[in-house]
């Protein structure tokens, strides 16, 4: 134990020295590029993984525990939507490490990786959970457990719905929908590697490990029609309407291209069956930019009267009702709309 403590202290001390030099260089240059930020932000994961490895080694023996540095086994490439794993190279590197240095318990660093040139990078927001899913997929694990500060995926936001309960079983589709539309427990990107290999994900509470948590798998246990309700506030509706749109191909393509070029994310799309209007929901912070770029994209049609208006409705909220059991079940929409109507909530768009 004394030797392990001394070894960790030496590594920690050397890293602190390197960190000082990196920060001193950034201060002198008065700038820090992406590479510097990746290196600095990765130290926490390196230290915590090595510390856990040392603690486990002290308990069960150093020969049974290994710490592979994720920078040597996970290879990623930067794409427009974020880092993408180079699966073949990562799998080969990981298997080689496990063969050359086998152990009963492997503690792998989360959040950090390397590009094809061996330069350190990070997986960005929710990178640690994403790492767990990636390694679970690479190892074809029987299960991936994500430890958080809540009991699992909730049926609604408990701050708004006091009797919200933990959803003990969800399908991948249900979890993806809830995550995309506001549930903060797990990021949609985190689930992608696990889904590809059909590895179940379990969400557990670090502070209450006795709780069973939420299990996310290809098929969920039957548990009613609606699994959860979630929402996003701070939404703006951009409505493009005009008789000149009817039967004209390419209108939607031009609309989405204009928003894409401006870097504006679309939350929801709704189009009238008559093709007289298209409504999209965007973050309210981007409402002015969205209004401007859509106006420029259809400037000719607006001046000619083919399109009557580009209307912006602010301070809207998006409400999603999620559940695989709703498919083919009559009356669900009627209950939702009835409840909203009783509460005097106006519905502006449906998808």
Predicted regions mapped to residue ranges:
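A conserved regulatory-domain signal marking ACT and ACT-like small-molecule sensing domains
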Residues: 213-351
């Amino acid at each position: 134990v004394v030797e392990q403590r001394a070894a960790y202290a030496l590594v920690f001390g050397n890293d602190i020295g390197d960190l000082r030099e990196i920060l001193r260089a950034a201060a002198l240059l008065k700038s820090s590029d992406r590479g510097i930020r990746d290196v600095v932000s990765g130290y926490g994961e390196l230290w915590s993984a090595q510390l856990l490895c040392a603690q486990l080694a002290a308990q069960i023996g150093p020969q049974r525990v290994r710490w592979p540095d994720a920078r040597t086994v996970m290879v990623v490439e930067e794409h427009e939507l974020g880092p993408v794993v180079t699966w073949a190279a990562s799998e080969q590197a990981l298997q080689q490490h496990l063969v050359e240095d086998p152990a009963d318990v492997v503690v792998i660093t989360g959040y950090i990786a390397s590009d094809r040139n061996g330069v350190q990078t990070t997986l960005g927001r929710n990178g640690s959970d994403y790492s767990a899913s990636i390694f679970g997929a690479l190892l074809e694990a029987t299960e991936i457990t994500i430890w958080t500060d809540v009991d699992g995926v909730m049926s609604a936001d408990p701050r708004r719905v006091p009797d919200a309960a933990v959803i003990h079983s969800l399908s991948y589709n249900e979890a993806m929908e809830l995550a995309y539309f506001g549930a903060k427990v797990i990021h949609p990107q985190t689930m992608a590697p696990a889904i590809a290999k059909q590895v179940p994900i379990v969400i557990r509470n670090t502070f209450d490990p006795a709780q069973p948590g939420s299990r996310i798998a290809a098929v969920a246990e039957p548990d009613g029609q609606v699994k959860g309700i979630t929402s996003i506030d701070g939404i703006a509706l951009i409505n493009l309407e005009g008789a000149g749109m009817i039967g004209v191909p390419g209108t939607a393509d031009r609309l989405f291209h204009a928003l894409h070029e401006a870097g504006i994310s679309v939350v929801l799309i709704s189009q009238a069956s008559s093709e007289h209007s298209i409504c999209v929901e965007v973050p309210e912070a981007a409402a002015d930019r969205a209004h401007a770029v859509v106006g420029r994209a259809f400037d000719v049609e607006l001046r000619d009267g083919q399109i009557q208006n580009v209307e912006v409705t602010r301070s809207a909220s998006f409400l999603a009702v999620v559940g695989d059991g709703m498919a083919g079940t009559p009356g669900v929409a009627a209950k939702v709309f009835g409840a909203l109507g009783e509460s005097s909530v106006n519905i502006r768009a449906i998808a």
